[in-house]
C-alpha cells in the first residue's frame, strides 16, 4: 500500500524524481510490484465515463441508459426521474469498468488508474430541490478500488465534477452549466466537505488502500484572473481540511494522501501562490496537442512531443493526453487511424518519453465507443506491445 511519493534519482537519470514505492511498496495480492518495470514512473489510464459520464465517449451506452439526446448526467437524471436514473446508472457502473478490465490493464504493464468522480457521490451535498444526479455510486467506487488494490494498481481519485461546475458547458462537470458557478465561497465549502469525506473513507476503508492521491478539482477555468479565489481560498483550505481529517484519525504523516492540483502550465495561475504548506503536494498537467498552437503536421507533432519539457510545479503527472488530432483533419487519409498506425505508434512513444521526464502519464481514456484507438487505450494500437515501457516502444 502506498501513500507516500518521495525523492529519487538513480533509476531515472534525473536530478530529482519521485517513486510511488520508495517508502511503501504497492504489491498485488500475489506479491507483484507493477512499478518495478517502469522504474517507478506512473503509467496509467483514466476511467473516463465510469462515474462522470461524458456522452461523446460512449453514445451507445448513453442511449441504452435512456439518456440519448441529453447533454450531461444532470440532464439525464432530470429526464428519467431519480428512481429510474438510479437503476440505469447502477447498471452502467456495474458494467462499464469490470474486474476483467483491471486485469487487462495490468497485463499490459499499466500501474495506475485515475478515477474521475463528482461531488454528488456524497449525496447529502446535493440540493434535492434543484440538483439532479444519480445516487448509489459509492459502493461501486469501493468495489473498483478493491479490484485495483488487489491487482497492485496505484489509484488517484479526481474531483472531476465540482459544485456549480468549474467550467461552463462541459459534461465532464456532470452538468451542462451555462456559467462556471464553482468560484464562490459556498460552492468551495461543498467541495471541501466532499474532500474531507473522501479522505476519511480512503483511510478507514481497506478497499481504498491503494488510493494515494486526491485531486481537488479537474481542469478549472484557464484564466488566472478569473479564478484567483480558487488559489487564495480553495486550494489552501483544501490542504487544511484534508490534513485535519487525517489528523483526527491519527494518520501518520508518512501515510498522508498526496493532494493534487492543476499545475501552472494549465493556465489557472500558480497553485502554490497562497499555500503555506506543500507537504505531499502533487500537480497535474493535461497535454492535448489536438487543441494546442502547434503546426498540424506529423513532423511537427513528433518534434513537439520529443522536445516537451513541461517544466512547472513538481512533481507533475501528465494526467490526461491522447493521440487525437484536430477535428477538421482527423479522418482524412493523412491522419486516418487505420492507415497511419506507424505514425501514431511513434507519436505515442514520443509522448511517453516526454512525460516520463516528469513523474509519468495517464492516458485519456481506457475505454470508449468511438471506434478510434486515439481516444481508447483498450482500442488496440497501444496494446500491440505488452510491457509498454520496453525499449522497443520508447525508442523512436
From Swiss-Prot:
Pfam families: Cellulase. It comes from Aspergillus fumigatus (strain CBS 144.89 / FGSC A1163 / CEA10). Belongs to the glycosyl hydrolase 5 (cellulase A) family. This is Probable glucan endo-1,6-beta-glucosidase B. The active site is at residues 219, 320. It catalyses: Random hydrolysis of (1->6)-linkages in (1->6)-beta-D-glucans. It is found in: Secreted. PANTHER family: GLUCAN ENDO-1,6-BETA-GLUCOSIDASE B. Disulfide bonds: none annotated. Its EC number is 3.2.1.75. Beta-glucanases participate in the metabolism of beta-glucan, the main structural component of the cell wall. Acts on lutean, pustulan and 1,6-oligo-beta-D-glucosides. It comes from the Eukaryota. InterPro entries: Glyco_hydro_5, Glycoside_hydrolase_SF, Glycosyl_hydrolase_5. Keywords: Carbohydrate metabolism, Cell wall biogenesis/degradation, Glycoprotein, Glycosidase, Hydrolase, Polysaccharide degradation, Secreted, Signal. The gene is exgB.
